[in-house]
């Protein structure tokens, strides 16, 4: 991982570099084609590792973002039904205290629960120019879903 001020370091080195108050995690969209129970189990193991290495940090599990309606309708794997199912499963990893689940989709979705066309140019990924909006939303408390 390349980290500003640290250069290229391992994930272990990042976790050892300081005590974090908050850790935001979004994983799993690329694993939708694999058995979900296995992916969720690995996700849980990753969260357990974070808890062990950063016991005082609040971990925020972010929902995976939806894809556009067109992509969802045409893709047997990367569609919003599968994304929602996966998000429901990872939400169960949260305990509501030190591990919290936050759904970022309302920030980028259209009125029908799909990634709005204006936020993407590939039907899947939010454009980089919206990352600051995303970060600001999380920092502001994500409408009460993430405590300051």
List the model feature ranges, each with a label.
Residues 5-11, 57-64, 136-142:
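Low-complexity, flexible helical/coil segments
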Residues 26-30, 48-84:
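Active-site segments of SGNH/GDSL-like serine hydrolases
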Residues 43-48, 87, 91:
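Generic structural signal for well-ordered alpha-helices
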Residues 13-14, 45-50, 137, 141:
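A generic secondary-structure signal
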Residues 18-23, 54-59, 96-100:
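Loop/turn elements at helix/coil->beta-strand transitions in domains of secreted/extracellular proteins
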Residues 1-45:
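Conserved SGNH/GDSL esterase-like catalytic core that processes O-acyl groups on lipids
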Residues 15, 50-52, 91-94:
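N-terminal cationic-hydrophobic initiation segments that often serve targeting/anchoring roles
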Residues 66-148:
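Catalytic His-Asp segment of secreted/periplasmic serine-dependent ester chemistry enzymes
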């Amino acid at each position: 991982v390349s980290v500003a001020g640290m250069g290229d370091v391992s994930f272990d080195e990042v976790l050892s570099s300081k005590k974090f108050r908050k850790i935001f995690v979004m994983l799993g969209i690329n694993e939708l084609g694999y058995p979900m129970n296995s992916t969720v189990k690995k996700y849980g193991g990753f969260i357990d590792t974070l808890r062990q290495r950063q016991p005082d940090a609040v971990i925020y599990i972010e929902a995976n973002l939806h894809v556009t309606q067109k992509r969802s309708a045409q893709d047997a794997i990367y569609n919003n039904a599968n994304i929602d199912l996966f998000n429901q499963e990872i939400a169960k990893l949260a305990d509501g205290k030190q591990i919290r689940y936050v759904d970022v989709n309302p920030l980028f979705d259209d009125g029908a629960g799909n990634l709005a066309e204006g936020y993407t140019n590939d039907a899947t990924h939010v454009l980089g120019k919206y990352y600051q909006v995303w970060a600001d939303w999380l920092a502001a408390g994500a409408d009460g879903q993430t405590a300051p």
